[in-house]
């Protein structure tokens, strides 16, 4: 009888240990799951130009200049293009547009159309850029040009947006934020001109999608 009693005690101890270790195991699993989620995001800094970046990153002036110049080239390739200066100004405001290089991603037929109407086509000035580490753990930096409208009637007014129209908040350089790694991926080249107000519509749609996604995520976390 004593031996049987001893066996029951051992069984009890195992059962007690299992019940009390389970929450710990779940917590460890949750930590690894969160770590996996974090790997899909990237911390980036927002700068207006290379000088802003250099001031915030002493000793990294060369990297800041390279990232800024690369962002300018990317802006030429991916920024919304307009057939006339007036269309661009209506979207982004006076003093916010420039002539785009003829080779900046546009299809030849659209270049010809723009040249017939005004001699060239137009694009917004790069208002700033995002800068983050290169994917894959590289030693270099990735960058993404940002645009902003000075026209109060535009959905992009006072905001940083990328070439696809995604909104990254107030157009205030010096901020640091977390973005999906896809945000730093190269955007497709612009191959057609945008109609007046077309980019603003894209920004409005993207903002609606972002709010909807944020609401869905909040509801999911809250059960």
Curated annotation (Swiss-Prot):
Q: Which Pfam families match?
A: DUF1190
Q: Where is the composition biased (Polar residues)?
A: 204-223
Question: Which parts of the chain span the membrane according to its record?
Answer: none
**Per its UniProt record, what InterPro entries does this chain match?**
Biofilm_formation_YgiB
NCBIfam families, A to Z = PRK11653.1 (NF008655)
UniProt-recorded name of the protein: UPF0441 protein YgiB
Originating species: Salmonella paratyphi A (strain AKU_12601)
Write out the ranges of the annotated region (Disordered): 178-223
Q: Where along the chain is composition biased (Low complexity)?
A: 178-195
Tell me which family the UniProt entry assigns to this protein: Belongs to the UPF0441 family.
